[in-house]
Curated annotation (Swiss-Prot):
GO terms for molecular function: calcium ion binding; mannosyl-oligosaccharide 1,2-alpha-mannosidase activity. The active site is at residue 374. GO terms for biological process: carbohydrate metabolic process; ERAD pathway; protein glycosylation. Its main location: cytoplasm. Belongs to the glycosyl hydrolase 47 family. This is Probable mannosyl-oligosaccharide alpha-1,2-mannosidase 1B. The lineage of its organism: Eukaryota, Fungi, Dikarya, Ascomycota, Pezizomycotina. It comes from Aspergillus terreus (strain NIH 2624 / FGSC A1156). Its cofactor is Ca(2+); Mg(2+). Keywords: Carbohydrate metabolism, Cytoplasmic vesicle, Disulfide bond, Glycoprotein, Glycosidase, Hydrolase, Metal-binding, Signal. It is an enzyme of class 3 (hydrolase). It holds the Pfam family Glyco_hydro_47.
Length: 508
């Protein structure tokens, strides 16, 4: 999950043709075959291309500007792209890049920055990236780095970072400030925090406690989470499990009852089921709340465009009215239902998750570039005159046509592929990668697009978000590489669980 506001500053590949319908629970196709291996190598080349451009033009800054070959420091100048790339480089077994990143992390001083720090973004990218690297290099990738001190450093740096950040939780309620000044221990004066921003800390901070033996970090994040699990006032929960979008920092009470799975709310729901995967015994209440939210979403938020009743999207809800719009960010939802369905052995969740995946696939399949837009809608009373044909054919119209290298659609395709074994979903992943490689690739990396439904993407944004490395490249590669401990598994066989930045953590 990332906040919804836009931060703007290979060789010829053939598209695979997807089948029209997906069989349910077909036996998984063999992962290791010549085509998959060839594609995996192409994906690794794309990752290395982006890394080489970042290393040449932007390192040690946060991100590359891949059109001008400049750089940006949107994440405090600690080298966000490097830290975010670590777990993907490990999974690709690229020891050269892994060691370059470890050398970088060792010299980062997380106590120094002149800019406001986002507790949320810093947790999911930096803390998540380092903890995941530690789990992977201490576990299934233990032979990749010979110097164990380099690996141990990841945990040391993780603890140092959390110690810099933890004052954010020092509020009357324990609900943290998000935008903080680590030099003065100040904040932006906000009176409330967002649902996802508050509810997407618990996995990383709990994992840190488990690895260090210091329970302070888990207690801080779980105290904040407690207000989200037992929402007050009752009016902030219009349907069981579905809660408002903002929480008072003073009292821990919700300040509204606006419900959605969109950006700003999304990863709260994502982490409910993932905490259960992390430890089913300790986090049974989180599972119960996810199930309540899932059931309510199926009953009250599921929406079908008038021109494409075969498609399913999740609407938002506020004050008795449904909002018939959604976002690229929201398209993680299919993966969440699929994960919950397989872990809880519930075919209804799996079927609904696949319906959501199909809807989000249409947002890619129907555009000129084959890439989905930042935001879209299906309100039949608000269709722009110049998009009526699109709405008639595809069941949605575009509100913002930007693409800033987001991963959520591919992420849900990955869950669909791993959980059903149906080859179609891997083809959808490949098609998306081919389109991104065609329209976003520059001489030094990958750039965002201004309009996915315009010729050549309507121009490029001169920015390469760090989550290109952490998420897009990882999910595409995982779908084309062999089975491994870190892969999503059917049923209760998961040895790892992914944070919202696609960094895999070892489960308890």
């Amino acid at each position: 999950m990332h906040l919804p506001s836009l931060s703007l500053p290979l060789a010829a590949l053939t598209l695979a043709t997807p089948s029209l319908a997906y069989p349910y629970y077909r036996t998984e196709q063999p992962l290791q075959n010549n085509l998959a291996q060839s594609r995996a190598n192409t994906i690794k080349e794309a990752f290395s291309h982006a890394w080489d451009g970042y290393k040449k033009y932007a390192y040690p800054h946060d991100e590359l500007h891949p059109v001008s070959n400049g750089y940006g420091d949107s994440r405090n100048g600690w080298g966000a792209s490097a830290v975010d790339a670590l777990s993907t480089a490990i999974i690709m077994r690229n020891a050269t890049i892994v060691n370059q990143i470890l050398d970088h992390i060792a010299q980062v001083d997380y106590s120094k920055t002149n800019d406001t720090v986002s507790l949320f973004e810093t947790t999911i990218r930096y803390l998540g990236g380092m903890l995941s690297g530690y789990d992977l290099l201490k576990g299934p990738a233990s032979g990749l780095v010979r110097d164990s001190k380099k690996v141990d450093m990841l945990l040391t740096q993780s603890k140092k970072l959390a110690d810099v950040l933890k004052f954010a939780f020092d509020t009357p309620s324990g609900v943290p400030y998000n935008n903080i000044n680590i030099n003065t221990h100040g904040n932006d004066g906000a009176t409330s925090n967002g649902l996802a921003v508050t509810g997407t800390l618990v996995l990383e901070w709990t994992r840190l406690s488990d690895l260090t033996g210091d329970d302070e970090y888990a207690k801080l994040s779980q105290k904040a989470q407690s207000y989200l699990l037992k929402p007050q006032p009752a009016s902030s929960e219009p349907f069981p499990g579905l809660v408002g979008s903002h929480i008072s920092i003073e009292t821990g009470e919700f300040t509204d009852a606006q419900v959605s799975w969109n950006g700003g709310d999304d990863s709260f729901y994502e982490y409910l089921i993932k905490m259960y995967v992390y430890d089913p015994e300790a986090f049974g209440e989180y599972k119960d709340r996810w199930e309540a939210a899932a059931q309510s979403s199926m009953e009250h938020l599921a929406s079908h465009p008038s021109t494409r009743p075969d498609l399913t999207f999740l609407a938002s809800y506020n004050d008795g009215k449904l909002g018939l719009s959604s976002q690229h960010l929201t398209c993680f939802d299919g993966g969440s239902f699929l994960l919950g369905g397989t872990v809880l052995d519930n075919d209804d969740y799996i079927k609904f998750g696949l319906d959501l995946v199909k809807g989000c696939h249409e947002t890619y399949n129907a555009t000129l570039t084959g890439i989905g837009p930042e935001s879209f809608a299906w309100d039949p009373n608000s269709v722009p005159s110049n998009q009526k044909a699109l709405y008639e054919k595809a069941g949605f119209y575009i509100q913002s046509g930007a693409y800033i290298l987001r991963p959520e659609v591919i992420e849900s395709f990955y869950y669909a592929y791993r959980i059903t074994g149906e080859e179609q979903y891997r083809e959808w992943i490949w098609n998306a990668f081919v389109a991104i490689n065609k329209y976003c690739r520059t001489s030094s990396g990958f750039a965002g697009l201004q309009d996915v439904n315009a010729a050549n993407g309507g121009g490029r944004y001169d920015n390469q978000e760090s989550f290109l490395f952490a998420e897009v490249m990882k999910y595409v590669y995982l779908a084309h590489s062999g089975d491994a401990e870190w892969q999503v598994q059917r049923g209760n066989g998961n040895k790892f669980v992914f944070n919202t930045e696609a960094h895999p953590f070892r489960v308890r």
